[in-house]
Amino acid sequence: MSEIKIKDNESLDNALRRFKKQCAKSGVMAEVRKREHYEKPSVKRKKKAEAARKKKF
């Protein structure tokens, strides 16, 4: 879990901006999107193979 300490005289907007940046850097939202719906192992393999094919060309 990302956590920030609000500094003295820091606005809520700045604190929220720092929190969002920290979440993006740690990959929290990407992980949430990835785990939002269950993905069968066979589907994962197909996506991985397709990504490898796209990367190769």
Curated annotation (Swiss-Prot):
Q: Name one GO cellular component term.
A: ribonucleoprotein complex
Query: Region (Disordered) spans which residues?
Result: 35-57
Question: Which residues are connected by disulfide bridges in this protein?
Answer: none
Q: Name one GO molecular function term.
A: structural constituent of ribosome
Q: Which Gene3D superfamilies match?
A: Ribosomal protein S8
Domain of life of the source: Bacteria
**Biological process (GO), any one:** translation
Is Nucleotide-binding a UniProt keyword of this protein?
no
In its keyword annotation, does this UniProt entry include Ribosomal protein? yes
- Supply the alphabetized keyword list: Ribonucleoprotein, Ribosomal protein
Q: Where is the composition biased (Basic residues)?
A: 43-57
Q: Which family does it belong to?
A: Belongs to the bacterial ribosomal protein bS21 family.
Write down the HAMAP family for this protein, in alphabetical order. Answer: Ribosomal_bS21
Q: Write down what this protein is called.
A: Small ribosomal subunit protein bS21
This protein's species is Alkaliphilus metalliredigens (strain QYMF)
